[in-house]
């Protein structure tokens, strides 16, 4: 039982580390989602080579 508990703790710790390490600002947004991604940022969304650019 303690091995299972240890395994669960390791998995949870890895999930927390991955959440901290991953940078949500650098997520790639496609052209279809670009207007919704830039909404609320007072931006002019454009799509360059399939990557969304909010042009604030």
UniProtKB/Swiss-Prot annotation:
Expressed by the venom gland. Residues 1-28 form the signal peptide. Keywords: Calcium-activated potassium channel impairing toxin, Disulfide bond, Ion channel impairing toxin, Neurotoxin, Potassium channel impairing toxin, Secreted, Signal, Toxin. GO terms for molecular function: ion channel inhibitor activity; potassium channel regulator activity; toxin activity. Transmembrane segments: none annotated. It is found in: Secreted. The keyword Disulfide bond applies. It comes from the Eukaryota. Disulfide bonds join 31-47, 34-52, 38-54. The keyword Disulfide bond applies. One of its GO terms (cellular component) is extracellular region. Belongs to the short scorpion toxin superfamily. Potassium channel inhibitor family. Alpha-KTx 09 subfamily. Has the structural arrangement of an alpha-helix connected to a beta-sheet by disulfide bonds (CSalpha/beta). Blocks small conductance calcium-activated potassium channels (KCNN, SK). Low toxicity by intracerebroventricular injection into mice. This is Potassium channel toxin alpha-KTx 9.2. It comes from Olivierus martensii (Manchurian scorpion).
